[in-house]
Structures are given as C-alpha cells and as structure tokens.
Amino acid sequence: MAKGQSLQDPFLNALRRERVPVSIYLVNGIKLQGQVESFDQFVILLKNTVSQMVYKHAISTVVPARPFNVNSHTAAPSPAGGFNGQQDDNNDQ
C-alpha cells in the first residue's frame, strides 16, 4: 500500500463511518458540503440532497465539521489518539 493511501483511507473511512459532515474544497475554489457516502482510489461519493461523484484529483482540502477519531476501529491508535483538526507535533515515527 502506498504511503499516501495509509493515511487517506482511514481518514475517509472514519468520516464515512461516523457520518461526519464535511466541506470539500476543489482546486478551482468551489466548496462542496455533505457526508462521505463512499470512496475508492479515484473518487469520493459525497451525499447531501443529491449524491455527487467528486474526482480526488480535483480536491484541494477536506475539512471535517467536527472532531472525530480516525482510529476508533483499528488495533493500534496513533500517538495523537485520532484526528481532531490539530496537527501532531510528535513527528519522530
């Protein structure tokens, strides 16, 4: 598994599993809002009043509306205990 996928997949899966509302900013500046319904290697299915298939190469930023735990269903939690919108200053991994 590629290094980029090792963070991206658990992050998106936790957003999906916990039904966290998100704002997705595209590279052209457009803001989309909804919940992650599903995702794969290339796209994210974003659900609001309608479902939208958003290509990952068009995404700049994914912003959760509330704190959530990325590792709530995995065996080895990170030292930060999950993603809460704060960057972990402990980069000695």
Curated annotation (Swiss-Prot):
InterPro entries: Hfq (IPR005001), LSM_dom_sf (IPR010920), Sm (IPR047575). One of its GO terms (biological process) is regulation of DNA-templated transcription. Keywords: RNA-binding, Stress response. Residues 9-68 form the Sm domain. One of its GO terms (cellular component) is cytosol. Residues 70-93 are annotated as: Disordered. One of its GO terms (molecular function) is RNA binding. RNA chaperone that binds small regulatory RNA (sRNAs) and mRNAs to facilitate mRNA translational regulation in response to envelope stress, environmental stress and changes in metabolite concentrations. Also binds with high specificity to tRNAs. Homohexamer. Belongs to the Hfq family. This is RNA-binding protein Hfq. It comes from Shewanella sediminis (strain HAW-EB3). The gene is hfq.
